[in-house]
Amino acid sequence: MARIAGVDIPRDKRVVISLTYVFGIGRTTAQQVLKEAGVSEDTRVRDLTEEELGKIRDVIDKLKVEGDLRREVSLNIKRLIEIGSYRGIRHRRGLPVRGQNSKNNARTRKGPRRTVANKKK
């Protein structure tokens, strides 16, 4: 397995797909990285030379990926919570942040239902 940005990428897949295993690199970014490194998208990872791997690593080192990106995202969320913005409050309460309806759905964000017992009349 080739190791890029601290992640073991699968050898049997095409390079453009394998690069998406790195957090912060999707299909589009992977295509741009390969274009800049001068590597064909159809090449399998096992067929890459050390020189090509080095070029890919150099291009990816310029990007914010893995730990740095995760840290930046968490700091952004922490900042929203500290300034008390609407989005920060939604993050703190564990509710949807982007305006989705939360009366009936939003189960992914809210977690499993907590049933409330009925009062006897």
Swiss-Prot record:
Segments of skewed composition (Basic residues):
106-121
Cite a GO CC annotation. small ribosomal subunit
One function term, GO molecular function aspect: tRNA binding
Q: Where is this region: Disordered?
A: 93-121
Keyword Zinc, does the record have it? no
The answer to whether keyword Cell membrane applies is no
GO biological process per UniProt: translation
Give the matching PROSITE patterns.
Answer: RIBOSOMAL_S13_1, RIBOSOMAL_S13_2
Which Pfam families does the protein's record reference? Ribosomal_S13
Q: Which domain of life is it from?
A: Bacteria
Q: Which UniProt keywords apply?
A: Ribonucleoprotein, Ribosomal protein, RNA-binding, rRNA-binding, tRNA-binding
Tell me, what does this protein do in biology?
Answer: Located at the top of the head of the 30S subunit, it contacts several helices of the 16S rRNA. In the 70S ribosome it contacts the 23S rRNA (bridge B1a) and protein L5 of the 50S subunit (bridge B1b), connecting the 2 subunits; these bridges are implicated in subunit movement. Contacts the tRNAs in the A and P-sites.
- Spell out the subunit comment: Part of the 30S ribosomal subunit. Forms a loose heterodimer with protein S19. Forms two bridges to the 50S subunit in the 70S ribosome.
Protein family per UniProt: Belongs to the universal ribosomal protein uS13 family.
Provide the protein name.
Small ribosomal subunit protein uS13
Q: Name the gene behind this protein.
A: rpsM
